[in-house]
């Protein structure tokens, strides 16, 4: 049963771009996206704080669900909608502080064991990946494919889920057909020949999520 220790999110978060700059946040919110993540890697908090502040302000302006990847202290300090953490971050993060601050929590998973770990944290949503081969980041695990994704979705039937990893415009309908609540995309938008057109098509397929 879906009873997270953190504030709930809609079962369907819709199209969920993951981007590395405030510029992309602004572009995509203007284009109609309503769930989005700022993922800046390998910088100190003081180096990214201005970007986090700007992204959160944009999220509020567009009434969007803006998640901050990794920088949970900054997300708490500036009252973001939510935080997204990888498995490697769970042990070093003060989850109770995030919960007390009223932020939503998303957690990445790559296999059954990591799903068990995520469920123990009782997050707002669980991300399942990587579905297809991806060039966006180095992955120690193998792509799961659609059959494995279906199995995980069946296990997490009443939990908000997000599929991520190598999801292209062409793959999107088949991924959503598994019953997953949302699709997270990176290069399908940021490396598209026409990002506006790609975003519009993906929004038509995945929607903006439930209210």
Curated annotation (Swiss-Prot):
Keywords: Magnesium, Metal-binding, Thiamine biosynthesis, Transferase. Pathway: Cofactor biosynthesis; thiamine diphosphate biosynthesis; thiamine phosphate from 4-amino-2-methyl-5-diphosphomethylpyrimidine and 4-methyl-5-(2-phosphoethyl)-thiazole: step 1/1. Pfam families: TMP-TENI. GO terms for biological process: thiamine biosynthetic process; thiamine diphosphate biosynthetic process. GO terms for molecular function: magnesium ion binding; thiamine-phosphate diphosphorylase activity. Mg(2+) binds at residues 70, 89. 2-[(2R,5Z)-2-carboxy-4-methylthiazol-5(2H)-ylidene]ethyl phosphate binds at residues 134-136, 166, 186-187. Its cofactor is Mg(2+). It comes from the Bacteria. Its EC number is 2.5.1.3. Binds 1 Mg(2+) ion per subunit. Belongs to the thiamine-phosphate synthase family. Condenses 4-methyl-5-(beta-hydroxyethyl)thiazole monophosphate (THZ-P) and 2-methyl-4-amino-5-hydroxymethyl pyrimidine pyrophosphate (HMP-PP) to form thiamine monophosphate (TMP). This is Thiamine-phosphate synthase. The lineage of its organism: Bacteria, Pseudomonadati, Pseudomonadota, Gammaproteobacteria, Enterobacterales. The gene is thiE.
């Amino acid at each position: 049963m879906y009873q997270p220790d953190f504030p709930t999110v809609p079962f369907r978060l819709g199209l969920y771009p993951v981007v590395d700059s405030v510029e992309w946040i602004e572009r995509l919110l203007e284009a109609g996206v309503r769930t989005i993540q700022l993922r800046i890697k390998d910088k100190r908090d003081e180096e990214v704080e201005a970007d986090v502040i700007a992204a959160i302000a944009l999220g509020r302006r567009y009434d969007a669900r803006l998640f901050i990847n990794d920088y949970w202290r900054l997300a708490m300090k500036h009252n973001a909608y939510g935080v997204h953490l990888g498995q490697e971050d769970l042990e070093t993060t003060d989850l109770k502080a995030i919960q007390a601050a009223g932020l939503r929590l998303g957690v990445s998973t790559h296999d059954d064991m990591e799903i068990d770990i995520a469920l123990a944290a009782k997050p707002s949503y669980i991300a399942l990946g990587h579905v297809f081969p991806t060039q966006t980041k180095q992955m120690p695990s193998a792509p799961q494919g659609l059959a494995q994704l279906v199995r995980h979705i069946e296990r997490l039937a009443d939990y908000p889920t997000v599929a991520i990893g190598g999801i292209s415009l062409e793959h999107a309908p088949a991924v959503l057909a598994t019953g997953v609540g949302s699709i997270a995309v990176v290069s399908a938008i940021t490396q598209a020949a026409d990002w506006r057109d790609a975003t519009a098509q993906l929004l038509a397929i995945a929607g903006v999520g439930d209210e």
